[in-house]
Regions:
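Active-site acidic-Proline motif in GNAT/NAT acetyltransferases
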Residues: 98-100, 104, 133-134
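Conserved acetyl-CoA-binding loop-helix of GNAT-fold acetyltransferases
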Residues: 103-117, 140-144
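A short, well-structured alpha-helix characteristic of acyl/acetyltransferase catalytic modules
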Residues: 1-51, 175-186
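Short glycine/proline-centered loop/turn elements that form peptide/ligand docking sites
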Residues: 107, 111, 135-138, 155-160
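Acetyl-CoA-dependent GNAT
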Residues: 43-100, 172-174, 184-185
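Conserved catalytic-core motifs of GNAT/GCN5-like acyltransferases
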Residues: 128-131, 148-164
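Conserved GNAT acetyl-CoA-binding A-motif
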Residues: 120-130
């Protein structure tokens, strides 16, 4: 499958998401290692339900497939959602569905690409993420890029006999200094 190269980095590029990969995304969404981190572990996600969800993802937001630059393979999804153009903010959601591509810096680069888009194309000033206290990989990724923790909802999620906080982090446009888009304009 040929993907469009909307935002291009060294390790990955972002291609507008649609329902063509519903089978693959449904497999990822039903993978326990993915769904436990996204909070969707109890959701019953069929291919048809995933297709319907993917078809609506770009309504009121921007959704992209994360594509590995080495082999043009879709490995995850990243999106801006709950966008307020009045208050110029949004929520970012992301996962690397293919476990062979985790811990290689691709998630970091994909996050930087979508933040560049958020701040320098659609002119947002604040982007927030919501994750869980056990998801140290996501928390560390966000801290490395410049996100700051802004609050917690204590004991918000229960898995087995374990309770975990929901962690809220955000980044302002003034905290983000890695723009590919601004370089293109020079």
């Amino acid at each position: 499958m040929e993907f469009l190269k909307k935002l291009v980095g060294d390790k990955c590029y972002l291609s507008p998401a649609d329902a063509t990969l519903a089978d693959k995304v449904a497999r990822w969404s039903n993978d326990l290692r993915v769904s436990v981190r996204t909070g969707d572990i109890s959701d019953m996600i069929t291919v048809d339900a995933q297709r319907e969800y993917l078809n609506g993802m770009n309504e009121g937001g921007y959704a992209f497939y994360i594509i590995d630059s080495e082999n043009d393979e879709a490995i995850g999804v990243i999106r801006l959602m709950r966008i307020s153009h009045i208050h110029r903010n949004a929520v970012l959601g992301m996962f690397i569905g293919d476990s062979n591509h985790r811990n290689k810096g691709i998630g970091t680069e994909a996050t930087k690409l979508i933040l560049d888009f958020a701040f320098n194309v659609i002119n947002l000033r604040n982007v927030m993420i919501e994750t869980f206290s056990f998801n140290e990989r996501a928390i560390n990724l966000c801290k490395k890029i410049g996100f700051k923790e802004i609050g917690r909802r204590r004991n918000a999620i229960i898995y087995g006999n374990n309770e975990f906080d929901e962690v809220f982090m955000d980044i302002l446009n003034t905290d983000f200094h890695e723009s590919i888009i601004c370089e293109v304009l020079k």
